[in-house]
Amino acid sequence: MKLIKNLMPLKSAEKIVFEKLSEYLDENKKVKEVDIVEALNRISAEDIKAPIDLPYFNKAAMDGYAVIAEDTFGASETNPIILNLADGDEITYGEAKKIFTGDKLPKNANAVVMKEFCNEVDDFVEVYKTVHPNENVSRIGEDVKKGDVVLKKGEIINPYHLNMLASLGIKKIKVYDLSFGIISTGDELINLDEIRDIEEDISKLDGKIINSNSYMLYGLVKNLGFNAKIYDIVKDDKEKLKKAIKTALSENDALLITGGTSVSERDITVETVRELGDVIVHGVNIRPGKPFGFGIINDKPVFMLSGYPVASAVQFELFIQRFFIERKKVTLPLKRNMASELGRVDFVRVKVDIEVEPIRITGSGVISSLIKSDGYILIPENVEGYEKGELVDVYLLK
């Protein structure tokens, strides 16, 4: 059995891939300015800073009466303070103005007495509770101060971001705008639409594998807010693969090829890419996902991913997802011992609770482990594992 020699350290491979991706995005201006409603679920290509304070005026946080707090000092149920009702944009000492949640405070007002502690009679109001300055008031800049970063470059834009952006008067933002072609290779693959009834057709498959990787990769790309197109399966034929690669790259910004990345006679992907362009990375010291490849054809990035689902998902996470998005990280104790082998980085799928538990299922193709995992741990190449109770960094997937 042939082995990939001279495996590249993960950090070195990531650095190379990320630098090439950055160059491609910068040189080809793969950034698009869109209306904020079109930005939902896409990746921000810039830091957005608040152009104003939010709120930009002092406003009532409760229904009640806007007052000058000092007027209420000493007020109680047995000793109410009586204030005259005002009806303008300004109050003076001895006055109060009826106000509703979200209303702008009148000039000079610095507190709100909740309506439950007031009794309005004719043109005055009895106040039964002392309030302090800024009580029941949302102050200028309390939510966001001018200059605060409200959306970071690399964040996926969610509905709450849209609320914030609209509140700040921001109508358009820049997002990454990319399209990925997806090609699956291998004589052993068949298309999903060739299956009428899996229970009836299972005996006819004769060891064939349904092309499921394309659907997973399609979903991963779409989750980043990018466009994706699945191409027909390409058998283990170099000329047919060349033709498919040329077509996909003519229609997309980048290409994902899954399968054929190892070094057996049937693994033709890396050699084919090399004949069409440059292979910059092939073989990384990670498990699963060792036979990862990255190349450039006609100045466009080509990712060569494993045919095994878990390995392919890991490679996508490490070399594409992590370039665009910074995963949230938590530190938690391990529920049980976790072994590793020196000289490689182990990507361990885990379940996350008050402790983190490695998923026992192993292998590069075990699909269920992807569904069950909430996050992952990266065990460095110089660590032989972790012991139960040891604190570890967990990257969250959900």
UniProtKB/Swiss-Prot annotation:
GO biological process terms on file: Mo-molybdopterin cofactor biosynthetic process
Positions in coiled-coil regions: none
Entries under PANTHER family matching the protein: MOLYBDOPTERIN BIOSYNTHESIS PROTEIN, MOLYBDOPTERIN BIOSYNTHESIS PROTEIN MJ0666-RELATED
Pathway: Cofactor biosynthesis; molybdopterin biosynthesis
Matching Pfam families: MoCF_biosynth, MoeA_C, MoeA_N
Xref: SUPFAM superfamilies: MoeA C-terminal domain-like (SSF63867), MoeA N-terminal region -like (SSF63882), Molybdenum cofactor biosynthesis proteins (SSF53218)
Protein name: Putative molybdopterin biosynthesis protein MJ0666
Similarity remark: Belongs to the MoeA family.
A GO cellular-component term linked to this record: cytoplasm
Signal sequence residues: none
NCBIfam families given in the database record: molyb_syn
Entry's Gene Ontology molecular function annotations: molybdopterin molybdotransferase activity
Keywords in alphabetical order: Molybdenum cofactor biosynthesis
Organism: Methanocaldococcus jannaschii (strain ATCC 43067 / DSM 2661 / JAL-1 / JCM 10045 / NBRC 100440)
